[in-house]
Amino acid sequence: MNIEELYRTYFDIVYRYIRSVSRDGALAEEVTQETFFKALKKADQFRGDCDVRVWLCQIAKNTLYDHLKKQKKQLSGEEQPETAESHGGEIFEEKLAQRSQAMEIHKVLHGLSEPYKEVFSLRTFGELNFREIGMLFGKSENWARVTYYRARVKIREELEHEDHM
């Protein structure tokens, strides 16, 4: 598979994964582009012992972490600016309610500890199967299933707790 095919086939998956972890569309775009650049440079190092998606998501995760470390050094203790996406047009109540619920889920998700947050994101947004997630972490498929299930339970409990407040 050449780089163009790789890019067309996996761009969306890598982008959605990084977007779900970072919650920043511009950053996700930048990291995804850099991921494919790194993948091109390191294509000869791909051993084929895991799915290409797993390999690309691992590169993307490391690239994101590198980017965040670099950004943290640049900000040197300053509060990181929040990014807000502007949405044009009229938003109907139903869409607003769905978005509000999605934001609540994202808030709870990003409050989870690792590896729950990442496993949930890889499964839900990165569309990786449990075997691939296990390989990414150097763990078993069963570990990935249990971790995902526990993340779902934690998210559900936190959302129910917030509803009762």
Task: Give a label for each model feature.
Residues 11, 15, 36, 113, ...:
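C-terminal flanking helix
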Residues 119-123:
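A short pre-motif secondary-structure segment
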Residues 131, 135-161:
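DNA-recognition helix of helix-turn-helix
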Residues 14, 18, 56, 60-68:
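Hydrophobic-face residues of short alpha-helical interaction/recognition segments
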Residues 1-16:
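A short, charge-rich alpha-helical start-of-domain segment used by transcription regulators
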